[in-house]
Amino acid sequence: MWSEKGGLVKMSEIIQVNGQRFFLRTWGEPKNPVLLLLHGFPEFSGAWEELAPLLSDQVYCVAPDQRGYGQSFRPSDLESYKIHHLVSDVVGILEHIGGSAIVLGHDWGASVAYALAMSHPTMVEKLIIMNGVHPLPFQRALVESPEQIAASQYIHWLRRAGSEQVLVENDFERLRAMFSHGMNMQWLSGEKWDAYRSAWGDVEGVKAMVNWYRATGLYVPKLDEPIEPMPHMEAGEMMIQMPHLLLWGAADTALLPQSYAGLEALAPQLKFASIPDTDHWLHHQKPEAVADIILNWI
């Protein structure tokens, strides 16, 4: 399906990856370097509608609905949402579009992007992360930082049985409140709000999204329980060897600066840039500023 928007050719298509359906949005010309865009919770490939057109003169933007989201396939079992399955999806998508790419991940998409960069480094030419976390610094923050522990308590609520039912009630009132807590959500209104509601669909759609939290082995201490020791993680196996850009909206209330502390020891080619007056949703709030930094870096 082809459409014109602001002089830009945009395409959407359905592909098969490992025998499963994936929905892709693309912007720009396939002859350009590929930029794979991985959304987080609770978004979908339409999350890039503001940013991708600003990049597409120089890169070919490819954005999938990830497993369990939007129009892509939605497994019902929890095992299917473990990180190695999510990475396998992205490997298949990259093989479909050419084999390697610049990879950009936000939120949960950042977790997949980091895992891909560690397990399949030749497929990631450059790595861009926006308000997302490498597993080692984040797990350390969840053991050592009272502020990050407090900020991450919502994960326990999401992991509860039946949380998806509460999230869909009253036209997704709780879901919208959860990802707007303490942050600027003026961008989520009108047609965009309608698009998000459509992407979430129903209770089964929201359950699939929440299953990403249920399937992860991330240790999040509870506020009323003793903190267990830092789980063993082998730093030598978690290095990010390719050029790495970390973009950050400093007013994020879910992921605090402690969540990326020490990242430079794992990423020798790290560059950090903070976007003023933005929070977790920087790609919606200041897409022009984000695009300028990305284009100057790549």
Predicted segments, located by residue:
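Alpha/beta-hydrolase fold catalytic core
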Residues: 1-35, 56-60, 98-100, 268, ...
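Flexible "cap/lid" subdomain of the alpha/beta-hydrolase fold that forms the substrate-access gate
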Residues: 20-22, 34, 62, 69-104, ...
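Conserved HGGG/HGGXW glycine-rich cap/lid loop of the alpha/beta-hydrolase fold
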Residues: 26-74
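A short, glycine- and basic residue-enriched loop/turn
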Residues: 45, 111, 278-279
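Charged catalytic carboxylate motif
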Residues: 47, 89, 208, 289, ...
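Short, hydrophobic alpha-helix immediately C-terminal to the catalytic nucleophile
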Residues: 49, 114-118, 291
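A short acidic, amphipathic alpha-helical/loop segment
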Residues: 50-51, 259-262, 289
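Catalytic histidine-centered segment of alpha/beta-hydrolase-like enzymes
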Residues: 278-287, 291
